[in-house]
Every structure is written in C-alpha cells, then in structure tokens.
Regions:
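Extended C-terminal regions of large enzymes
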Residues: 53, 74-76, 151-186, 192-700
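Structured core elements
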Residues: 8-13, 20, 59, 102, ...
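Short, basic, helix/turn surface patches
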Residues: 126-148, 404-413, 698-700
Length: 700
C-alpha cells in the first residue's frame, strides 16, 4: 500500500517490552481508523475483559487521507473498552491536533498498545526508531509539563499525547492531550494509566505518498473555493452581509465587520466580511471564543487555531493575564463544550471581575487549563450536569461523609468563585474523597449513590441511555434521525453528519429540496420542534448519517466539517458534493473509488461495530438490551401532544417502529436488531458470522 496508507502496524507489548511491525494491508477492507480499531478489538479482546485488564488493547489508527494534506484530515481514532459506561463495551475516542499526521509521517497506520509495564514508561517514536523509555520522572506531572519535558529530550517537532494525574489515578472520565489542547477522551487516559504508559511521543519525517498530486491540488482548490463553509460546515454568515443571500444568527460563520481578534499580536485584527471563493481567508470565518462565550471574549482572543491540515481553525486561543492569579498559564484555548462547560456548575453564574460577563470567560479559561492539564474528560458535559443534579437535589449532602462535606467551600460555589473549580478538579483528578466518584461516570454514580429513576428521567440532565452516556444531537436534531443515531454506539454518538446539515443556515425550503435529492422525499427533513411520524426517507437519512461518520472515522476526516452536503455558493444553488471523499480517496491512493463503494465500506465497519457489541454483551437482543432511551425523551413537555409544534419529545410506539425500519434498512434482524448471517456475508464478514454462530449470537 504505497499511496495513502503506510502499510505498517506498530505493536507495542508493554509487559514484555517487545516492539514489532506488522502489515496493515490485511485490514484493507476496513479502510483505516475506526475500521482497523474494531477489527483488532474484535479479534484480540475476548468477552469478559475489563478496561484495566492487561488483555485490553488501546488501538490508535489513522486512515489513508490523514497526512496527505486533504483538508480537515488530522484525526486519529482511538479504540478500547469503555471505562465509564455499563458493560465496558467497545468505544472510540477521536483526537485531532497533530498526532495523527505525525503518526503517518513516521510510517504507521496503527499503533497497538497491549500489556502493562512494570513501572511508568513513555513510548518514543522517531520514524523507524521506536523505544520504551523510563517515565518515573514524568509520573505525577500534568499533560503540559510532560509534553515540555519530552520535547526537551527529543525535538520541538515531536508531538506528544500524554495523560495527566487523572489518567495515572485511573479516573474513568479521563483522556489524553496532544498539541496542548487537543484531547482524546472516552476514558482512554485511564487505560493508558492502567498500563503505566505516561505518553506516546512521535516525530515523523517521511511524508505520505500521493498517487496524483495535480488532482489532489485541484480537489483542494475546488473544496476550498466552492464547498467548504465554517465550523460544522455552516454555509451562511451569522449576520446579514453584502455578499450573502441568507444569514442565520445560529451559524458558526461568525466573521463580520467590527468583530476583532482583540488580543492579536501587533494589535487587533478585524475578521470582516469573508465571502466564499478566497481560500486564504477561510480561517477567519469561525470565531469560537465569541460564539461559545459571548462578546466579553473578544478582547482576550489572540487568534483561532486548529489541527494539522485544517483551514477552519475552530480552536480558540486566548490570553488573559489575570488567570495567573489562579495558578494557571494566562494562555490557552479549546472549542465547543470544553470552552464553556466549566462555569456551568455555578448555580448563580460565575462572578464577574471587571466587565459584564468576563467571569464566564475568565472562569472557563482557568477551568479548561486545569481540566486539560489534569487530563480529565467531561463526557460531553455530563460530568458537570451530574454535579449540578447532585448539588441541587441534595445528593452530595446525603452521600458525602460529614467531614468531607464540611470542608468543601460550597459558599464559593454559590458565589461563582473560580477557586471552587480549582478545588473541584483537584479532587476529581487525585480521587480525593467521595465527591471524586462523580468522575466514575453516570452509570457508576447512579448505582453507587442509589439515584433511581428520578435521575435517569430528569430532562435537564440530558442522559440519553441507561448505559450512562448523554445526548449528542439526538431528538432535538431531526427527531427520529438523531434518536436512532444516538442509540447505535456505546457512548455519546459523536456524529455530526445530520446536525451539520440541520445547522447549515439555509432556509427550510432549500434544506427540504436537498433532503429530497438525497433521501427520496422532502419528508425526510422536519422543522425543529415540528416533527412528523417516521417514514422511509427519515430512515435513509439516519443510515446516511451513521455511515458517513463511520466513513470519516475510517479515512480519518473531521466529521465536524465533512461531508460537503451543502455549499455557500448561490451559483451552485447551495448544493455540495457528497462524492468528494471518494474523489480525494482516488487521488491519494490511486485506487478507483466511488461514493457507493465507500458507503459500502462504511456499512461494513458499522456492522462490525454492532457485531463487536453483540459479542461483548453476549446477547442477540440489541433492541431490548442495548438500544434503550431514557424516559424523559418521551415524557417531557407533558402539556404538548407528540408531533405537535413546540416540542421535540418522541413517541414510544413511533420509536419502536423507527428502530424496526432501521434494522431492516441495515439488513439486521428486524426484531432483535443484531446482524444476520446473510448481511455479514454480503459485507465480506464471513469470519465474524462464523464466530458469532459458534457462540449462538446469530438470529435464527
């Protein structure tokens, strides 16, 4: 596999110290990334394995587009067993930054970590030179200091994925950080900690071979000038502008006249109006600090940054000198939930310092710097919602020992004092006291603290599944489509295919026209909170959403931007190009490829995930044992009938029918929701079919 892929799997056994090289071409039908991860986990991790067992694996896998220069392609898929949900099933973390590109430049499609080191180590990779190094001097340090120490020992060009104290202490809600603020969550930090692996440091100098460089450049120019929008591929500006036919205040295309990077080096830089067509100004479109935190963030924003080979630049970079008062660096940044979640625990809001709402900006920079340095992970905000629930409902007063409860500064919490965040995160990362169990995850605290149905059924807490993971663009995002999507994985679904389309900013009429072209009927697309019962077009929409996220996690593209469903250009009638992944695939690998072939590969990967879940759960009955939804989704808004304007609640009978229709569309058993032998064979998964049959896990 000379083009796109490197052809190499690096296997590191921490128990024996053996480091070996394998051929990744044996997994080629699974494309890369997520596909490689699931196949390795299915083959090598038996049912009954626990997350912290030596038998568990940690699989870092990239795809053929990563490292090629394709836009938004620096993603690595990290697959292991969940530390934080019921059943400890297979899950993925999705990490951006520069780690994935450096993996490819060093010559590896996959890194498999197995076993457990006797004492702390870090993995050093410089092209073909790979070694395990002692990490005793790093143990106890945060992710930032660990990265700095390793870069001093190696090179400033080294990319380090490191855990902090949370991972060392096996905190289930922990992750790893690379390139300062780019995280891989889903408990993978604790998996590394359980293996005594402090960090993986990689530097590559080889590059990625591209079959057709001229076509690659043409596709890049085409995407950058005609197709790409802003963060989440929103394709209209958030304010009316001279060049734009449409605008939408919810759009992440936030650039406008009078909006500045207020703390830029050399003086403020105006984002201005950024019409499509000029690829050199795409990076000004998205302004996440103001979008996430409000106008008070403008004067502290240095610039937007982002991942390797990404023009969108969705990562805020801020400089707030006064945060040093709280013992953290004055600079930092992130995007989305990580930008704003930290001050949500304050029942009366954060306390302002000098300007209106600056408490939210300052408090969140303090919070995210601490959170990232400790290597904590918020489970898409669920950690903080669980805190709010337990505080407001008196759970902490009931379950914390009296001495511990008395020593916590609840007065700081009520006052919106940032010092409370410091103490709270320290306790979580160092597992101090009963409160620290909050970071065990929702399922664990519900069991440990006997929270009962009130907890699971509380709408504001946003728990989607009784397995202990939250909503991630679910019933509020295209009704049954988002609801089906949220049922399918073993953590929050991390699927943005459908929400990017919904949030594009285009008017409803245009979106429904596009839906008809893609899914056969305008009825695939409902206006938000004005839903209709399930239909065949919605099922096709749900399947497409899931297959595209699996495809992106296999070729390793960013599903926050891809696919190019719509365009910002009126001259294209705002139509995108859903064959673009296949066009890049062909240009990079040299292999003939179509949209349909890639969709089939994605279906193979998605069905393998389902088979892996069946095997680990040791049950065929996915409908009644896995695809479960918390009661609030059906019981919210009791005064508004379902399928009435003004509510996004779902109907139980309609969701039952939706799942049945979706199972049929996937070729799974329509009652059980598990893959059939026929479908597994159609997808080239004969070995999986034989294994499931041997364990009586195929439907009759």
């Amino acid at each position: 596999m000379a083009n796109g892929w490197t052809g190499n799997i690096l296997r590191v056994n921490l128990t024996t110290g053996n480091i070996t090289l394998e051929d990744s071409s044996k997994f080629k039908s699974f494309v890369g990334g997520m596909g490689f991860g699931y196949k390795i986990m299915y083959d090598e991790v038996p049912p009954g394995t626990k997350p912290f067992d030596e038998a568990n694996k940690l699989v870092f896998a990239t795809g053929p587009l990563t490292g090629s220069g394709a836009p938004c392609s620096s993603r690595v898929n990290i697959t292991s067993l969940s530390t934080f949900t019921k059943g400890n099933l297979v899950v993925d973390a999705h990490m951006g930054g520069f780690f994935a590109a450096q993996m490819k430049f060093a010559g590896y499609d996959v890194i498999i970590i197995e076993g457990k080191a006797k004492s702390p180590v870090w993995l050093k990779i410089k092209d073909d030179k790979v070694s395990l190094e002692k990490a005793d001097f790093l143990w106890g340090k945060g992710t930032r200091a660990t990265t700095e120490e390793i870069c001093r020992l190696t090179s400033p060009e080294t990319c380090v994925a490191a855990i902090g104290q949370a991972g060392e202490n096996l905190v289930p809600l922990s992750g790893m950080l690379n390139s300062r603020n780019h995280s891989g969550g889903a408990g993978t930090g604790a998996i590394m900690g359980s293996k005594n692996l402090k960090a993986i440091a990689v530097e590559g100098t080889k590059g990625v071979n591209i079959a057709d460089r001229q076509e690659m450049k043409r596709l890049n120019d085409y995407m950058m000038t005609e197709l790409i929008g802003a963060n989440n591929n929103h394709v209209v500006p958030s304010t009316p502008q001279s060049w734009a036919e449409y605008s939408d205040p919810k759009s992440r295309w936030t650039a406008r006249k009078g909006l500045f990077w207020g703390a830029a080096e050399g003086g403020p830089i105006e984002t201005g109006e950024i019409p499509p067509g000029n690829q050199n100004t795409v990076g000004f479109r998205t302004y996440k600090s103001v979008f996430d935190l409000g106008p008070a963030a403008e004067k502290y924003t240095v610039k937007m940054s982002g991942c390797h080979s990404c023009p969108i630049r969705c990562m805020t970079q801020m400089n707030i000198p006064r945060v040093k008062e709280f013992g953290v660096p004055s600079t930092g940044g992130n995007t989305c939930v990580a930008n704003f979640v930290h001050t949500t625990i304050f029942p009366n809001g954060p306390k302002d310092f000098e300007d209106k709402d600056d408490g939210r900006v300052i408090g969140n920079l303090v919070g995210l710097n601490l959170f990232d340095d400790y290597g904590l992970w918020c489970n898409y905000g669920q950690l903080h919602r669980d805190f709010t629930y337990c505080y407001s409902k008196g759970v902490f007063k009931r379950v914390l020992p009296a001495e511990e409860y008395a020593e916590i500064h609840w007065d700081q919490l009520e006052a919106g004092d940032v010092n409370f965040i410091k103490d709270f995160y320290y306790r979580l990362a160092h597992r101090v006291g009963e409160l620290s169990h909050l970071a065990d995850g929702s399922y664990a605290i519900a069991e440990r603290w006997n929270l009962g149905e009130e907890y699971w059924g509380y709408a504001k807490n946003k728990l989607w599944s009784p397995f202990g993971y939250p909503v991630h663009h679910a019933n509020e995002a295209s009704a049954q489509v988002g609801s089906i999507v949220n049922c399918m994985f073993n953590r929050d679904c991390m699927t943005h295919t459908h929400i990017n389309f919904i949030g594009s900013g285009l008017p409803l009429k245009l979106q429904r026209e596009v839906a008809k072209e893609l899914f056969g009927s305008e009825d695939a697309y409902d206006e938000t909170k004005n839903y209709t019962p399930i239909n065949d077009a919605k099922i096709k929409y749900a399947k497409w959403s899931l297959l595209r996220v699996c495809l992106h996690n296999a070729v390793t593209l960013c599903n926050w931007v891809w696919p190019m469903t719509v365009s910002p250009l009126k001259s294209r009638n705002y139509r995108g190009d859903l064959a673009l992944e296949a066009k890049f695939f062909k240009a990079i690998t040299g292999e003939e490829m179509t949209q349909e072939k890639l969709d089939l590969a994605a279906e193979r990967i998605f069905t393998l995930h389902r088979a892996c879940t069946v095997k680990l759960m040791q049950t065929k009955d996915m409908r009644n044992e896995h695809d479960l939804i918390c009661s609030w989704v059906f019981d919210k808004d009791p005064q508004i009938p379902v399928f009435t304007e003004g509510t996004d609640k779902m109907d139980r009978d309609d969701m039952h029918a939706s799942l049945t229709m979706f199972y049929k569309e996937m070729g799974w058993d329509p009652q059980l929701g598990c893959p059939t032998r026929e479908t597994l064979q159609r997808l080239g998964l004969e070995d999986i079919a034989a294994d499931l049959a041997a364990h009586n896990l195929l439907p009759v």
